């Protein structure tokens, strides 16, 4: 058997020199040579998981946490295909996720030989492939053309594994990846809009931000003093509460601003989608991803937020030209009243959960409903800067994996996901023993199925057979899942049950099942939907 010793060692050394600082490794036979070198490289940070799909989302979480490139390593066949959901998410987040997939020799392609699929260009536009059919095809610097702004796929054809091969000493260390410089887009157009066009009203919408983006975004919002809609994942939702509009989609539809300035990722608020039908509002985005987030014309400036704002120069105060914050006070008061009168609703449970989670150093929000509820109902008294989510392209896929990746080095971390989300990704909890010791709380809102689908227009009028297909109702408890993975289990049905969270043990892993009252949840939804703007 042929062991591709120098080839594999050289490939992994180049990846390390290109800045790959952590490795998420999945088991297999075809990738054994890669695993043997990684096992011998004692100075590299390595994680392992049997589920490639989950492993890729865990790697994405690690990238979110450390801001550096991470690789996921798989064997051949559908093991490589399992990476696709996380690859798509990483593409739209512009994260440096490296996919290193082992492949059978190129002669097997198109043959339907066991565990042989067409792996070159497997991920389409989402991750270009560098296809290494032979050792001679390895370039001198395999990552030299990678921009680190989206995933990259290295597909390496390997002979049959040799379990007896000893790679010897493997002194591999990660180097610093290159820094991104400059920005793209028209600053002059943005500057004119802020200075002149904003006299007709300006609203600042802040999507997800990386930690280095929070200070410049905070500074700009405080300078402009315009109404702000800040997602929890911006890390600024609480700090900018004095400027904020709360649950203001209807208000903004009735009183659209002349100019909307978006900072960071695409916002979650419904009004962002409504902008498709409001051409009179000029939209300007300042974002590291470069995506407009809209199907209509808008202006996008792409790059480092701090560098862009520095280039803009002095910023004039705009203020709340249209008096939106004053008009929003009535809705804020109604929301607070409803949380008191419906304490067992999903909305009130999210508020209570957020009060406890605020003492953590990491919060993770999974799937649509927890994200939207958190943005509207979570506490605003205590700043929570480190809030993460994979919200862009997937709903329930890989959310627990992402949480564990983000929180792997945290001392106190909290997550809130839906019930279908938790069931879909529960095997990610097999990663728990590898993580740093710390207090982790996984909150699961169990509303008996896909609760968000019950709120879709016309859902109430659907026949029961259709509702089953749409909502996926169930009567499962999460106690067995907690026990399977060695987690403490708590159930919360009432406001008083939250007192249990006062007695969490240090370095404990706890699954908290929140079981809300459906009638109270629906009461809040209908009151807010029918309330005057």
Swiss-Prot record:
What metabolic or biological pathway is this protein involved in? Answer: Quinol/quinone metabolism; 1,4-dihydroxy-2-naphthoate biosynthesis; 1,4-dihydroxy-2-naphthoate from chorismate: step 2/7; Quinol/quinone metabolism; menaquinone biosynthesis
Cofactor descriptive note: Binds 1 thiamine pyrophosphate per subunit.
The catalytic activity of this protein is classed by the Enzyme Commission as: 2.2.1.9
Q: Which Gene3D superfamilies match?
A: 3.40.50.970, TPP-binding domain
Give me any GO biological process, just one.
Answer: menaquinone biosynthetic process
Q: Which GO terms describe its molecular function?
A: 2-succinyl-5-enolpyruvyl-6-hydroxy-3-cyclohexene-1-carboxylic-acid synthase activity; magnesium ion binding; manganese ion binding; thiamine pyrophosphate binding
What Pfam families does this protein map onto? TPP_enzyme_N
Keyword set, alphabetical order: Magnesium, Manganese, Menaquinone biosynthesis, Metal-binding, Thiamine pyrophosphate, Transferase
Q: Which cysteines are joined by disulfide bonds?
A: none
Q: Tell me what reaction this enzyme catalyses.
A: isochorismate + 2-oxoglutarate + H(+) = 5-enolpyruvoyl-6-hydroxy-2-succinyl-cyclohex-3-ene-1-carboxylate + CO2
Which cofactors does the annotated protein need, by name? Mg(2+); Mn(2+); thiamine diphosphate
The record ties this protein, via HAMAP family, to:
MenD
Family assignment from sequence similarity: Belongs to the TPP enzyme family. MenD subfamily.
Role, per record = Catalyzes the thiamine diphosphate-dependent decarboxylation of 2-oxoglutarate and the subsequent addition of the resulting succinic semialdehyde-thiamine pyrophosphate anion to isochorismate to yield 2-succinyl-5-enolpyruvyl-6-hydroxy-3-cyclohexene-1-carboxylate (SEPHCHC).
Summary of subunit composition and partner proteins: Homodimer.
Q: What is this protein called?
A: 2-succinyl-5-enolpyruvyl-6-hydroxy-3-cyclohexene-1-carboxylate synthase
What organism does the record attribute this protein to?
Answer: Akkermansia muciniphila (strain ATCC BAA-835 / DSM 22959 / JCM 33894 / BCRC 81048 / CCUG 64013 / CIP 107961 / Muc)
């Amino acid at each position: 058997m042929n062991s591709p010793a120098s080839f594999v060692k050289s490939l992994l050394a180049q990846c390390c020199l290109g800045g790959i600082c952590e490795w998420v490794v999945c088991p297999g036979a075809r990738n054994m040579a890669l695993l043997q070198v990684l096992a011998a490289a004692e100075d590299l940070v390595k994680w392992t998981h049997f589920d490639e799909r989950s492993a890729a989302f865990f790697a994405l979480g690690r990238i979110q946490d450390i801001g550096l490139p991470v690789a996921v390593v798989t064997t051949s066949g559908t093991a490589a295909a399992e990476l696709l959901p996380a690859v798509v998410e990483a593409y739209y987040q512009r994260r440096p996720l490296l996919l290193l997939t082992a492949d059978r020799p190129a002669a097997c392609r198109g043959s339907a030989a066991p565990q042989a699929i067409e792996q070159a260009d497997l991920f389409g536009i989402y991750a270009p492939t560098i296809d290494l059919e032979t050792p001679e095809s390895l370039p001198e610097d395999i990552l030299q053309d990678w921009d680190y702004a989206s995933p990259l796929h290295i597909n390496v054809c390997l002979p049959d594994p040799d379990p007896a091969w000893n790679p010897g000493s493997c002194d591999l260390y990660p180097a610093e990846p290159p820094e991104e410089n400059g920005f793209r887009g028209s600053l002059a157009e943005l500057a004119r809009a802020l200075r002149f066009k904003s006299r007709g009203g300006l609203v600042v919408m802040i999507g997800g931000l990386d930690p280095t983006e929070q200070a410049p975004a905070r500074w700009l919002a405080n300078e402009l003093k315009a109404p702000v809609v800040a997602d929890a994942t911006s890390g600024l939702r609480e700090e900018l509460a004095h400027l904020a509009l709360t649950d203001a989609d209807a208000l903004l539809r009735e009183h659209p601003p002349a100019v909307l300035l978006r900072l960071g990722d695409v916002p979650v608020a419904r009004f962002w989608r409504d902008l498709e039908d409001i051409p009179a509002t000029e939209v300007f985005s300042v974002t590291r991803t470069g995506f407009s987030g809209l199907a209509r014309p808008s202006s996008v400036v792409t790059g480092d937020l701090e560098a862009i704002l520095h280039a803009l120069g002095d910023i004039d105060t705009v203020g709340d030209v249209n008096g939106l914050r004053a008009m929003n006070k009535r809705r804020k008061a109604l929301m607070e009243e409803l949380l008191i009168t419906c304490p067992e609703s999903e909305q009130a449970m999210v508020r209570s959960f957020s009060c406890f989670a605020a003492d953590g150093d990491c919060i993770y929000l999974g799937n649509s409903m927890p994200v939207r509820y958190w943005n509207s109902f979570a506490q605003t008294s205590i700043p929570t800067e480190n809030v993460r989510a994979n919200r862009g392209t997937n709903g329930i896929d890989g959310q627990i994996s992402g949480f564990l990746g983000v929180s792997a080095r945290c001392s106190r971390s909290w997550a809130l996901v839906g019930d279908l989300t938790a069931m879909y990704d529960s095997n990610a909890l097999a990663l728990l023993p590898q993580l740093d010791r710390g207090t982790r709380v996984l909150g699961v809102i169990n509303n008996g199925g896909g609760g968000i689908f019950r709120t879709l227009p016309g859902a109430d009028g659907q026949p029961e057979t259709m509702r089953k297909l749409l909502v996926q109702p169930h009567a499962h408890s999460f106690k067995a899942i907690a026990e399977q993975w060695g987690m403490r289990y708590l159930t919360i049905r009432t406001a008083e049950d939250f007192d249990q969270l006062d007695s969490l043990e240090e370095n404990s892993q706890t699954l908290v099942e929140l079981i809300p009252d459906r009638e109270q949840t629906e009461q809040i939804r209908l009151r807010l939907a029918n309330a005057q703007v």
